[in-house]
Every structure is written in C-alpha cells, then in structure tokens.
A protein has these predicted regions:
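Active-site mouth of glycoside hydrolases
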Residues: 1-100, 114
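Amphipathic alpha-helical segments in well-structured domains
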Residues: 29, 57, 61, 121, ...
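Proline-centered loop/turn at the N-terminus of a beta-strand
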Residues: 43, 74-76, 132-135, 168
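Active-site clefts of carbohydrate-active enzymes
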Residues: 50, 88, 101-109, 118-153, ...
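Structural recognition of alpha->loop->beta junctions
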Residues: 93-104, 160-169
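Aromatic- and carboxylate-lined catalytic core of secreted/periplasmic carbohydrate-active enzymes
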Residues: 134, 142-146, 151-266, 275-284
C-alpha cells in the first residue's frame, strides 16, 4: 500500500476489524503458506515498499509465524517500508522489534547516492548494534535511463558500498530499475566473489577512519586491521591507508569490477601511511 488509501489494508483487528474481508485474506495467505512452508529457505516480507499502518504488517507477521509453528518451521520475517530516509520514524517499526522481525530490508537506501548512501547504512548498522540482525538490500536500484534518473554507475556503486558496509545480501533490481543480470551486473557479482575468495567479508568491518587525504565518495574501506583491508574506488582517485601501527608485508591485489577480472598486484609494507592509487579511473 504505497499511498495506503485502500480499505483492503485496514482489515485487521487493531485497525478497522473488517471481518468480512479479513476472512478471505487469511484464506489466501494460508493457501500460499501451504506451498511455501514446505521449503526451509524462504524469507517472508509482509509488504513491498509500504506506507501501511504498523498494525497491518504486525498482524500478518504473527499470522505467518503461527502457521509456520504449526508445521514445525522456523521462519524469518521482515517488513519493507517505502521511506527513502532510513532515519525516518517509520523504519523504527522494524528496527525496534527484533521479536517480530528477524532481519531488516533497507532497499530504499538505494535511492540515495554517494557518501549519504554509505552513511545511512552505517546509521542503521549502529542503531541495530545492541541486537544485530541481517541487513538486506533486495532492490539495488540504478540503471541508465530508469524512471528515477539513475545510471548504471549508480547501481554498481550502491552494490559495492553495501558490500563493504556489511549488508547480508545485495541484489541488482530488475531492469529497467536496476541492472538485473546484464553484463555489468554479472561482472560486479563475479568481482565480489573474487574478493570473497581473498577476504571473508564477515571478518571485516567498515573502517574509513583509516583512510587519509580522502574526498567524499572517493574511496571506501572495510578492514580487520593488521590482517586484511578491502577498499573500493568508484572512480579512480588516490588516498592513504594508515598502516603505521602494523608490521609486516601485505599483498595488494586489484580487481577490475568492470570486467570481473584480476588486475595488477603489488606489495605494501606496514609502519607508515601508504598511498593507494587504482590502476585506472573506474570501479576498482
């Protein structure tokens, strides 16, 4: 319910308690669950880009969980709000209820760009830190000539920022809102898997504070200091990486995100701040 004007979305007991319509809604959802609960890998989202009342999603979350329990299934639930501002009160309806929603979906952050996009995600990460939950971005928007005025580059940047910031999952949204699995999307995913072959991404955390001489949106870093550093450059540039308190030598390996292929290699030694410059402009 994007505009949330349709009575269909006000039927639950704590709303308008429309028992006539609710009976059919429950039968429909129960029929869907007859099929989906046969499988253990299904994630359940109560709505798509909703502006609905909190009671609407809460009712269906309880309904799904109860039916799952009857089948001996543990299910994982969330709600997807339409507000592009992740700091908005509406998102707290999910963030503040880990007993109801097992993970969060912050896809609407993908309407934002650059440093703001990164900072918003980290805000949610910190907000959830007392009771961490997976943060998914099921819809990565960004494709040339889409209805939002985005570009292909926007989609690639959003994917990689979320990857280094700690998202549990990222997916390029379907064309024309996103790249889908076109050549650029596939290359970016391949590059991410190549990075993962070197650095388990769950072993590093956002660490832009280790970067120096950095402009907004110039480079992004996730690190396990002294062990591994994963850096993303959206459009070339040059920054310093603070290795002053670190001993030893590190292998520097570049991945060309445009092609999903390995790039040049080098060595870095600890004990100082080291300049890092990607091989060319573009996504590295």
């Amino acid at each position: 319910p994007g505009a949330n004007r349709q009575p269909f979305f006000f039927t639950t007991p704590k709303q308008r308690n429309n028992k006539v319509v609710l009976r059919y809604q429950e039968r429909f959802v129960a029929k869907l669950l007859e099929h989906s609960l046969a499988y253990g890998h299904v994630l359940y989202c109560m709505d798509n880009e909703t502006s609905g009342e909190e009671a609407w999603g809460a009712y269906w979350a309880e309904f799904v969980r109860e039916r799952a329990a009857e089948r001996g299934r543990k299910v994982h639930l969330t709600e997807m709000w339409d507000d592009w501002d992740l700091r908005a009160d509406r998102h707290r309806r999910t963030f503040d209820h880990p007993e109801r929603y097992d993970f969060v979906d912050v896809s609407q952050n993908n309407q934002n760009k650059g440093q703001e996009h990164w900072d918003n995600f980290l805000f949610v990460r910190e907000y959830l830190s007392s009771r961490p939950r997976p943060m998914n971005t099921t819809k990565t928007y960004g494709a040339d000539r889409n209805k939002f005025g985005h570009t292909d580059q926007d989609g690639i940047e959003r994917f990689w920022r979320h990857l280094l910031a700690g998202a549990a999952s990222m997916r390029f949204h379907r064309p024309d809102s996103g790249l889908g699995i076109n050549d650029k999307g596939v290359a970016a995913i391949r590059a991410a898997r190549m990075l993962e072959s070197l650095i388990p991404l769950w072993s590093v955390e956002p660490a832009n504070e280790l970067l120096g001489e950095r402009g907004d949106d110039e480079a992004y870093l996730a690190a396990a200091p002294g062990t591994a550093y994963a850096m993303y450059f959206p459009a070339g540039g040059e920054v310093t990486l603070d290795l002053a308190s670190v001993n030893g030598t590190f292998d520097l390996r570049w991945i060309d995100i445009a092609t999903g292929e390995w790039g040049p290699t080098a060595e870095l030694t600890g004990g100082a701040k080291r300049k890092i410059t990607p091989p060319t402009d573009g996504n590295w």
